[in-house]
Amino acid sequence: MVTGIQITKANDSALINSFWLLDEEKSQARCVCAKSVYSEDQIVPVSDLGQIEYREIPLEIKPEVRVEGGQHLNVNVLRRETLEDAVKHPEKYPQLTIRVSGYAVRFNSLTPEQQRDVIARTFTESL
């Protein structure tokens, strides 16, 4: 469980009045804001904070789970030839819609550079 705290007393005076999210399961603390030394979103072992006293801060929402290094997948069910023909003859494909960064977009509304990029990233020889 994650607990929000404001440090009220500490051996390190830079920690006083700083706000943290404590994850007791992992014995980690995430800095929300501090005067100096620690930067926002920095994660440290709770033991690095030393001897502290704090007051709990109610959290109105559950902390967002952050997945670093994740990937985004856009699925476009098309043949390469269809997109290449749409580049050459856009009038034949006025309703051709693809997914780009999670959004639906008309292929013909993309710049030529963006169209080439979509074709290059959508079709690969192997994984």
Curated annotation (Swiss-Prot):
Q: Which UniProt keywords apply?
A: Organic radical
Q: Name one Pfam family in it.
A: Gly_radical
Cysteine pairings via disulfide bonds: none
Q: Give a Gene Ontology cellular component term annotated to this protein.
A: cytosol
Stretches assigned to the Glycine radical domain: 5-127
SUPFAM superfamilies the UniProt entry points to: PFL-like glycyl radical enzymes (SSF51998)
The protein's matches in NCBIfam families, at most eight in alphabetical order, are given as: spare_glycyl
What name does the UniProt record give this protein? Autonomous glycyl radical cofactor
